[in-house]
């Protein structure tokens, strides 16, 4: 810049000596050196025209005007008789822009910053701007602790006054904090204060938040944390006097010194509220109540201000101002808080608009709204609409924007901006275990059918042991009040023996219809009716199965496997869901509780009841919700009525990707104990362990799972940011470390009758596993990978360390 001023000054001086003060009439204007810039464009930028009388000041203005276009790096104005001769040197045109050595800053971000400064391909090159960019980038590296970093712009000339621009980065290494000193602290130790910092001079291995790499922004955040720490404990006159950041000679070490004045502790003596309270003084006063003698607390003061704003926001005052001014009395060490409130204007909603819903119909989104058009703006109602859209599970993100209507003092438009995700999935599952080998499963599910909000599923399984098909449809808004209607039909041909379960075949089909009744924003009750026909055959005699048949008045021979039995059952189905998750998929905060159950009704062959309770709670441990603790439980119980038992084919099972990972699906819990209907079969069957009595085969233990009428499963997960994933895909990929445990038991098992066999009525036989899981919302649907190692198991359990599913998340 200084060179430019010197050049202009020298030109002005030379012009003065050439032209003199008397001026002359310009008869013609000629340019020399123009290449890219048209003559007409150059003439338009000049204040001098043909026929004008010009003097030294006009020439100076002409030079300044041509420089101001940004097209020239040198301008000279000469007189040739009555002709004005303008000699220019155009700035070169940027032909290409490349980067080298930048690891901390992505190319796209650099291009955006360059374009914001006017540096882009096809534009002229301003070397002064380049110098500013170099300095700005180096300042950025300094702010993140890389003090040895350098950025150089390399300009390579090309034909036709073009150049290649290359930014060469030498990022260096981040300076590490050697020591943090706090001077002036008496009430709290330095270790206690630093323990709340992100920046540390020592970071234990278990601390995933602390960092020894210096960053200016993090230091500013830590200083604010320090200030809040004192203000929250009554130190109303706390002050950070100064902060020194010292660099070691090799620029690899940082010493930080923070000088503070603690002051004394102060107690609140009272709160006085004044201003325009919009008629809500009583409610506001409730928010400002304090306990006598309570210590001054800065965080509580801020929360009080926010609560007042939220209160007024619920009544349509969209832009209230709340300011708290502490009046400190040093004599008695008290603080009186004066709160000034200006509610401002009450705003009404003109329109509610939706953006980004290319697939979902407006009506699907609009029916989730609690804010009405024409009513006053309620911030809580707008937020409820956002929560409900998130819980639909149709969108990756939902954002709200309140836009004032131009020309109106009291109207706004509420805009919901959504980013849709794939709501259809092709469900395909693969599992591999040391004992189970490979297993497959498939199906199709669409949660937002043609953008209507209907859920439609066509699921099927075909493998060595099962042929299953199901068609399900749910209309979440069967009535305008939000009553849902769902139904399904299914067919199942199940060969339990081939699934490593107890030996039997069950061919079943049925249907059910369910109504859902919303109670409030978070609770829904469900009720419905169902019918199922079960046709049992090839039942190999085993204790739990024969016990059930006996309760049904059936006493087949234990010496024959060719037994058959069929039932027709009608059920009353019920359920309750409490859902306060922050979004429908990949939640980060909130709780979901789901209770489902059924009980047979008159006209049924069986008489039993069955219920399952699922819970999931997400607790974020950071403000960005990237680190989350997830706790899950599942409890199930069922039993017979009127002296009958619950059918064995309705038993609960555990093991697999949705319960206890690391175990093969459905293999945790009681195992079949067979009657020796044909002893010679067992001699060649390694799965059976038959006892003998008086030289004859007695009962035979096996590894075939039979499930139980009671189940308990729990899981603790630590959800973490996925490494090596860009921010663009952060909302689509989830990584977690987990600890699963679970057990299944049979409350009707008589351990005294079967001494010498495992006590399958004992609920304390808990299995445990630990591992890592990766979930990805892919274009095909949710993909789930998990690897788990069982570390507590029992005889007969079957491990399946690696499991992979498409279409299943939790």
Curated annotation (Swiss-Prot):
Any single Gene Ontology cellular-component annotation: Bam protein complex
Its protein name is Outer membrane protein assembly factor BamA
Check the record and name the PROSITE patterns matching this protein. POTRA
Task: Please tell me whether the keyword Repeat is annotated for this protein.
Answer: yes
GO BP field: Gram-negative-bacterium-type cell outer membrane assembly; protein insertion into membrane
Where in or outside the cell it occurs: the entry states: Cell outer membrane
Oligomer status and interactors = Part of the Bam complex, which is composed of the outer membrane protein BamA, and four lipoproteins BamB, BamC, BamD and BamE.
Q: Where is the POTRA domain?
A: 24-91, 92-172, 175-263, 266-344, 347-421
This protein's species is Salmonella newport (strain SL254)
- As recorded in Swiss-Prot or TrEMBL, the protein's gene is named bamA
* Keyword list, A-Z: Cell outer membrane, Membrane, Repeat, Signal, Transmembrane, Transmembrane beta strand
* Origin: domain of life: Bacteria
């Amino acid at each position: 810049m200084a060179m430019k001023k010197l050049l202009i000054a020298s030109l002005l001086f030379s012009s003065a000596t050439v032209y003199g003060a008397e001026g002359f009439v310009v008869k013609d204007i000629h340019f020399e050196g123009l290449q890219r810039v048209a003559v007409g464009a150059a003439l338009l930028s000049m204040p001098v025209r043909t026929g004008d009388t010009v003097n030294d000041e006009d020439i100076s203005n002409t030079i300044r005007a041509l420089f101001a276009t940004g097209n020239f790096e040198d301008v000279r104005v000469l007189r040739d008789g009555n002709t004005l001769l303008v000699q220019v040197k155009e700035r070169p045109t940027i032909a290409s822009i490349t980067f080298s050595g930048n690891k901390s800053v992505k190319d796209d971000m650099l291009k955006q910053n360059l374009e914001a400064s006017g540096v882009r391909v096809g534009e002229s090159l301003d070397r002064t701007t380049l110098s500013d960019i170099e300095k700005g980038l180096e300042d950025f590296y300094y702010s993140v602790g890389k003090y040895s970093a350098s950025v150089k712009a390399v300009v390579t000339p090309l034909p036709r006054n073009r150049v290649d621009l290359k930014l060469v980065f030498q990022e260096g290494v981040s300076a590490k904090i050697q020591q943090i000193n706090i001077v002036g602290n008496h009430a709290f130790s330095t270790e206690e204060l630093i323990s709340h910092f992100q920046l540390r001079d020592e970071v234990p291995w278990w601390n995933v938040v602390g960092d020894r790499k210096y960053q200016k922004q993090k230091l500013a955040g830590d200083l604010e944390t320090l200030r809040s720490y004192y203000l929250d404990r009554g130190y109303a006159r706390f002050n950070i006097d100064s902060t020194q950041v010292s660099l070691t000679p090799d620029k690899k070490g940082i010493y930080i010194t923070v000088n503070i004045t603690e002051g004394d502790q102060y107690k609140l003596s009272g709160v006085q509220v004044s201003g325009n309270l919009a008629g809500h003084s009583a409610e506001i006063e409730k928010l400002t109540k304090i306990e006598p003698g309570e210590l001054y607390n800065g965080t509580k003061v801020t929360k009080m201000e926010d609560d007042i704003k939220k209160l007024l926001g619920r009544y349509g005052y969209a832009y209230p101002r709340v300011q708290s001014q502490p009046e400190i009395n040093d004599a008695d060490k008290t603080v009186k808080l004066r709160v000034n409130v200006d509610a401002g204007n009450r705003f009404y909603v003109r329109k509610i608009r939706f953006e980004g819903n290319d697939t979902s119909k407006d009506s699907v989104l609009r029916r989730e709204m609690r804010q009405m058009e024409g009513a006053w703006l309620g911030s809580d109602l707008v937020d409820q609409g956002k929560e409900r859209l998130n819980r639909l599970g149709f969108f990756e993100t939902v954002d709200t924007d309140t836009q004032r209507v131009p020309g109106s003092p009291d109207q706004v438009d509420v805009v919901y901006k959504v980013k849709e995700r794939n709501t259809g999935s092709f469900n395909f599952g693969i599992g591999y275990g040391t004992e189970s080998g490979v297993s497959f499963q498939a199906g199709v599910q669409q949660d937002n059918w043609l953008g209507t909000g209907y859920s439609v599923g066509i699921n099927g399984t075909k493998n060595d042991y099962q042929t299953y098909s199901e068609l399900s449809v749910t209309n979440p808004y069967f009535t305008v009040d939000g009553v849902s209607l769902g139904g399904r039909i299914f067919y199942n041909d199940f060969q339990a023996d081939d699934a490593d379960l107890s030996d039997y075949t069950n061919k079943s089909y049925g249907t059910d219809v369910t109504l859902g009744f919303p109670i409030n924003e978070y609770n829904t009750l469900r009720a419905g009716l169902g019918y199922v026909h079960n046709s049992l055959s090839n039942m190999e005699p085993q204790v739990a199965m024969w016990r059930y048949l006996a309760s049904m008045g059936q006493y087949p021979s234990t010496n024959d496997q060719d037994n058959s039995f069929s039932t027709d059952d009608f059920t009353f189905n019920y359920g309750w869901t409490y859902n306060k998750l922050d979004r429908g998929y990949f939640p980060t905060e909130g709780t979901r509780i789901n209770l489902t159950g059924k009980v047979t009704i008159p006209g049924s062959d069986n008489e039993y009841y069955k219920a399952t309770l699922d819970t999931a709670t997400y607790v974020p441990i950071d403000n960005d919700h990237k680190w989350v603790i997830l706790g899950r439980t599942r409890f199930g119980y069922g039993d017979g009525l009127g002296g009958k038992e619950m059918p064995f084919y309705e038993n609960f099972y555990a093991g697999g990707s949705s319960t206890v990972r690391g175990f093969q699906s459905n293999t945790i819990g009681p195992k079949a104990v067979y009657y020796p209907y044909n002893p010679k079969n067992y001699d060649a069957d390694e799965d059976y362990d038959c006892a003998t009595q008086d030289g004859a085969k007695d009962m035979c233990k096996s590894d075939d799972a039979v499930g139980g009428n009671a189940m308990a499963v729990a899981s603790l997960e630590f959800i973490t940011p996925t490494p090596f994933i860009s921010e663009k895909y952060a909302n689509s990929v989830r990584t977690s470390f987990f600890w699963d445990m679970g057990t299944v038991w049979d409350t009707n098992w008589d351990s005294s009758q079967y001494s010498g066999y495992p006590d399958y009525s004992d609920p304390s036989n808990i299995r445990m596993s630990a591992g890592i899981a990766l979930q990805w919302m892919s274009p095909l649907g949710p993909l789930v990978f998990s690897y788990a190692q069982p570390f507590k198991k029992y005889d007969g359990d079957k491990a399946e360390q690696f499991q992979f599913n498409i279409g299943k998340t939790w």
